[in-house]
Structures are given as C-alpha cells and as structure tokens.
C-alpha cells in the first residue's frame, strides 16, 4: 500500500513529497558520510520544482531492457520498484540517464512525446530530475553496499555497487557545479 502522506494533493507537492521520502531513505542507508551528497540534497531542496504539469504515474528507472515485447508492440513492463505519483519529467530524466539520447536527440524525443501525449515536460523540471534520479540511484546502490558491508548479503555484486555509486556521485557534482 502506498503511504497516504506520499500521495500528492496537487501539482505543487509532487517533487517535494518524493524528495522528503528519499532524504529519509538516504540517511537510513548511507554506510558512511558523503559531504557531496549532503550538498546535493541541499541543492535538491533549494531547486525543488514548485509545480508539476500534472500528477502522473512515474515508473522510475526505466532501462531499455525492461520492456516485454510481442512483435513490434510493448505488452508489459518490468521493474516497478521506484514507481510513484509525480512529475513525468522524472521518467525522461531516467531515460536520459539510461542513454536514450544516444538513439535520437533527447529534445526531439521529448518534443515527439509532447505532441503525441499532450503532456508537457518542463525543461527546468527535467534539469532538476536529472540530478534527483542520480541521487536516487546513488542511494539505491548504497543500500546494497551497506547490506554487503554489514555481512547481511555477501554477493560480490553488492560489494561492487559501492564503486559504481561513485560514478553517480561524479555526475551529481558536475550537474550541480559543486
């Protein structure tokens, strides 16, 4: 069940409520202090969009391998663990992070999406969510790393996540001009 306090009452609450949740998760899972991430959190609070173009279902972390195809049609999607109600710009930030811009120019893809769907993507919100999705990805990887460090899960992949998370940290530093 989705906690009631996470359901946006209107378009002004989308980003703020999700940020409050991820701030809590970040402080619960970080195995050690990360001053750059603390700075990123301050940046996210300061730049948090005041309005979303509407409340939409946000899938989150949509990689190109998560579609289930039947012929030329997508008939299902997998990996819904980051789904929530929010700003559709977040899904485009995840897509950009996953490399969709290598297939076609991101601006052209978003223009096409806006024309077909009628849903507008605010460029300022997209820029914000490009940092926020990196913050989320870093936090998720730290959660796995923490389980490894604590001895709760000894899969080598989880130990390696700590190294991978630093690539997200570098991107955050670059995007926030730290």
Where are each of the predicted segments found?
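Short, polar/flexible loop-turn hinges at active-site or ligand-entry regions and domain interfaces
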Residues: 1-6, 99-100, 121
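A cross-family kinase active-site recognition segment
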Residues: 1-42, 48-56, 84-85, 152-165
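Short glycine/proline- and charge-enriched loop/turn segments
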Residues: 19-24, 75-77, 90-95, 149-155
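Active-site acidic catalytic loop and adjacent metal/ATP-binding pocket
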Residues: 35-93
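Conserved beta-strand->loop/alpha-helix structural units within folded catalytic cores of enzymes
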Residues: 65-67, 124-127
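Active-site activation/catalytic loop segments of kinase-like enzymes and analogous catalytic loops
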Residues: 89-120, 132-152, 168-171
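Regulatory N- and C-terminal appendages and interdomain linkers associated
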Residues: 160-178
């Amino acid at each position: 069940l989705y906690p009631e306090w996470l359901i946006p009452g209107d378009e002004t609450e989308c980003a703020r409520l999700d940020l409050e949740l991820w701030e809590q998760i970040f402080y619960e899972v970080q195995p050690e202090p990360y001053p750059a991430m603390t700075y990123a959190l301050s940046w996210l609070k300061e730049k948090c969009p005041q309005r979303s173009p509407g409340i939409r279902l946000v899938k989150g972390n949509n990689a190109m391998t998560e579609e289930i195809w039947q012929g030329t049609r997508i008939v299902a999607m997998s990996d819904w663990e980051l789904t929530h109600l929010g700003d559709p710009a977040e899904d485009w930030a995840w897509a950009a992070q996953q490399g969709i811009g290598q297939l076609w120019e991101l601006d052209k893809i978003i223009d096409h999406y806006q024309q077909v769907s009628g849903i507008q993507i605010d460029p300022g919100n997209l820029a914000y969510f490009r940092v926020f999705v990196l913050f989320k990805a870093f936090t998720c990887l730290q959660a796995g790393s923490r389980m490894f460090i604590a001895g709760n899960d000894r899969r080598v992949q989880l130990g390696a996540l700590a190294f991978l998370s630093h690539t997200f940290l570098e991107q955050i530093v670059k995007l926030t001009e730290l």
